[in-house]
């Protein structure tokens, strides 16, 4: 009930509800009511599960007819846009850390790594704001924002992984970097497409007496898509987003029940993820940084 009150309060004052859930997590954390949660690996796992569900649901809501006119600029924003954002932000961090009064002096590659972790738009926040606020955006801006926010995470993820590998291996060649990008994009897109087709086939061919099991079957397919893509060295987030687009743009049995289930589950994991992130933040530790 408290979470519902927080959500209603955010909607009433025009504040994104997810931001309030982040604050609630901070208030319940070790510097607030004393709830201890400091396991970054568990938080990462929760984030992976949540983001997979959020991106799949976002893909289901993305219609080919809406994104077709803005497909090219949307892809450019989610690839080159993220790359340029990481580059310029990294250069700014490197320049700022070199100032005498900062006393940090970060190397350029470390600055680029920090910038890469924040270079993408948070798809959970964008989807939530566009849906809850019911914004009447013109010139196909809404589908472009949804496409960009849903497809830019793989680029930021790959930038981060490549830069970490570069640091750990004391340097990678340009061919290796380009090859890593190509493999993750191609394998992720191909796996998402074919497993999305397989999910459609299973939903339409399987005869299950209990209709409530169809959404559960699709949810298990989301995790299967992410896992198999990751094993093949592809990008799992791109795969689940494309698989969601395939499912959402084709005829499937029990569409209403599936959409209702996925919408509720998406909101649940958005709340869980931001509460978890809030619990990881200790305001007292930020004083020295500030």
Locations of the language-model features?
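Transmembrane helical cores of multi-pass secondary ion antiporters/exchangers
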Residues: 1-290
């Amino acid at each position: 009930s408290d979470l519902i009150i927080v959500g209603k309060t955010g909607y009433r004052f025009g504040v994104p509800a997810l931001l309030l859930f982040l604050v609630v997590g901070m208030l319940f954390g070790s510097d607030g009511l004393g709830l201890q949660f400091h396991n970054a690996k568990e938080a990462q796992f929760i984030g992976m599960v949540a983001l997979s569900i959020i991106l799949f649901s976002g893909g289901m809501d993305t219609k080919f007819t809406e994104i077709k006119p803005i497909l090219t600029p949307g892809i450019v924003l989610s690839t080159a846009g993220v790359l340029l954002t990481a580059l310029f932000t990294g250069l700014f961090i490197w320049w700022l850390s070199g100032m005498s009064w900062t006393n940090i002096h970060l190397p350029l590659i470390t600055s680029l790594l920090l910038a890469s972790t924040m270079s993408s738009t948070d798809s959970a926040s964008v989807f939530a704001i566009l849906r809850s606020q019911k914004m009447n955006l013109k010139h196909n801006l809404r589908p472009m924002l949804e496409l960009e926010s849903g497809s830019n995470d793989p680029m930021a993820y790959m930038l981060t992984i490549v830069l970490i590998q570069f640091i750990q291996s004391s340097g990678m060649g340009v061919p290796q970097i380009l090859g890593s990008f190509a493999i993750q994009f191609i394998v992720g897109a191909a796996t998402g497409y074919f497993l999305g087709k397989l999910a459609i086939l299973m939903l339409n061919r399987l005869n299950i007496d209990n209709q409530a099991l169809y959404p559960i079957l699709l949810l298990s397919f989301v995790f299967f898509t992410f896992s198999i893509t990751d094993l093949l060295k592809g990008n799992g987030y791109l795969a689940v987003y494309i698989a969601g687009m395939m499912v959402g743009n084709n005829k499937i049995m029990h569409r209403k029940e599936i959409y209702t289930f996925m919408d509720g589950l998406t909101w649940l994991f958005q709340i869980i993820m931001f509460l978890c992130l809030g619990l990881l933040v200790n305001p007292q530790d930020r004083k020295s940084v500030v």
